[in-house]
């Protein structure tokens, strides 16, 4: 179940020229946000999709909120997707997400993460290169300060021959903030 979500289907052979954009805006304190993003890019299709999750900081201080999110992406044969995911939750939000993508034969996924918000973020991300010639890139940037903690766990699985993946995360930390990245390429 989810309170908020997006379902995006790009039909076979359709090339979406302009980026698509969605925003999950989560104002308020002491509440939980549950979201689910489901994307299917059919054979030979192409799309750029930008998703933002954001909220203001708690003006009174002392409150806590939570976000639990799921992202599922399927890029079929000869399809291409650029997925830009931006997170700027308020400093009172505890953010947890599990995200998974599967790229089929000669498909291409460019997955870009940007994180500047939340009290704590724990993100699990898996990329399955399931078809021969599949290509996947995961890149991210983050800027933290105060007592923020960002934790990214990435996994790239080469399940078929002649697949290619690339990974690059960079960030800057200020104050007592912390960041953890761990990952594996199989």
Briefly describe each language-model feature range.
Residues 1-186:
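Conserved beta-strand/loop scaffold segments within soluble protein domains that form the structured core
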């Amino acid at each position: 179940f989810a309170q908020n979500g997006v379902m995006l289907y790009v039909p076979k052979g359709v090339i979406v020229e302009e980026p698509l954009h969605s925003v999950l805006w989560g104002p308020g304190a002491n509440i939980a946000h549950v979201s689910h993003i489901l994307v299917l890019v059919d054979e030979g299709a192409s799309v750029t999709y930008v998703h933002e999750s954001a909220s203001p900081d708690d003006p009174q201080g002392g409150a806590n909120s939570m976000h639990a999110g799921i992202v599922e992406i399927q890029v079929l044969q000869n399809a291409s997707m650029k997925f830009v995911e931006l997170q700027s939750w308020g400093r009172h939000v505890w953010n947890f997400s599990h995200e998974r993508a599967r790229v089929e034969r000669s498909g291409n996924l460019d997955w870009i993460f940007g994180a500047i918000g939340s009290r704590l973020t724990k993100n699990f991300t898996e990329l399955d290169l399931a078809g021969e010639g599949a290509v996947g890139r995961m890149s991210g940037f983050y800027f933290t300060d105060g007592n923020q903690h960002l934790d990214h766990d990435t996994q790239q699985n080469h399940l078929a021959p002649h697949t290619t993946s690339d990974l690059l995360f960079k960030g800057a930390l200020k104050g007592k903030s912390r960041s953890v990245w761990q990952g594996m390429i199989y």
